């Protein structure tokens, strides 16, 4: 098996091969609504010389019908096995999963002469890598695309993070018991919600912007001091530790900090948890489990009705009480 981050000229290289078939299977991960190609992007693939195969109902969760794909020139395939057998290149959102209807793992469908393009999270999924290696083939890990200008068009991770940050605020607003913006009524005043965002990457910046647009008071923290101006430009307060250490790592991502720094930031989070209404965590470190930043004790110290949204849940979670894919209601005073 060959596994690598896609380079800038990847599409141009494969597009020169005539009649290659690109397959888009239906995602089988529980609750996943996304699809790897829309009818519009399928048209673009066809213009590059690809034939596009789409599993029936693959786009249903994203409101794309089979007829919409057919109108775009795609061929609808009735089942996953037939699609994998026919495709030269398979496009997925999620990494290969155990298929509930086939009672087998999707990785077993990969052929030695086939290419899989999807999120893989190689460092977090060593068993999956071993399984894919046993199948042969080429795997392009979209989550491993470097954050450089040359690869910007391939940066699906940042695209999803931007949407995730926005959605985190919408979810928080849905579960929060009050308005985000302050209100003055005949019955009295209602203060604006206080939001703390931990991790000011693409998702964090999107969350800050969305929360500010709804009228909340927003604070943000990141180990990388270079993001301070970005936070302030969005009208939020940057929570800063007076510590001679910077968290900027390779490729613009955060790095692992010293024990002393971690202790200082945990003390800051414990203090802020008692004051804010909503905490949104987005902190990730490439190739490692998500750092634990919000402890159970901090959650218990928050005000009744407070909300924590953990965007790092699937990578281990930034919050100790996180249960991926679920809403946990607990710790009432």
Positions of the model-derived regions?
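A structured beta-alpha segment of the ubiquitous adenosine-cofactor-binding alpha/beta core
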Residues: 74-88, 96, 248-279, 283-300
